[in-house]
A protein has these predicted regions:
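Core catalytic alpha/beta fold that binds nucleotide/phospho-ligands
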Residues: 1-180
């Protein structure tokens, strides 16, 4: 049996002030890896942030509404959070969701639009592809199961009322949560 991927998720109130996300990332990094000097931050080809001098520290950041989240692991990780809000869900689904995902939304009583969105975004953060690949990812299996993307583990996270969140890892994750 494969050992679970260990993931620590830090969450904090998010005030959207200039530099807030960077300050919170620095604080979370110091908690996750206390002996590590503050690592430099760089961005991959599609904008995924990483620490070039600390490749053993994989992380993913997301913020929405009043919350900021960051997942740390020794292996690649993707995390997304979305505040439930009024939006043109049908139009967005037609533009960014596969036909299987659109059908899933239609036959599901509580239409988990934001769960689907978070699953897609967390996968793209995991792979480092960026949001340009949003339409190409299908998070519903051919049998209609959700969340499901071959080769990865998608886990919906019930963190905050009125929000959806999803974690994407290479294997099932053992999650530890901590509020900053």
């Amino acid at each position: 049996m494969t050992e679970p991927q260990r993931v620590t998720i830090y969450s904090a109130a998010y005030d959207r002030s200039p530099g807030a996300s960077h300050r919170l990332l620095r604080q979370a990094t110091q908690l996750y890896a206390p002996g590590l000097a503050e690592p430099a931050l760089a961005s991959g080809a599609h904008g995924k942030p990483y620490f070039p001098d600390a490749p053993q520290l994989q992380f993913s950041i997301s913020h929405s509404g009043a919350y900021w989240l960051c997942a740390f692991s020794a292996a690649p990780v993707g995390l997304d959070v979305q505040q439930h809000r009024d939006c043109q869900k049908q139009a967005l689904a037609r533009r960014f969701f596969s036909l299987a995902e659109q059908a899933f939304l239609e036959r599901t009583s509580h239409a988990p639009f934001f769960d689907l969105w978070c699953a897609k975004e967390s996968y793209l953060k995991f792979t480092g592809e960026g949001l340009s690949g949003l339409e190409a990812v299908c998070t519903v299996s051919p049998e209609g199961g959700f969340p499901s993307v071959p080769g990865v583990n998608l886990q919906l996270l019930p963190l905050f009322a009125g929000y959806s969140a999803c974690l994407c890892t290479a294997s099932p994750a053992e999650i530890r949560e901590q509020f900053l």
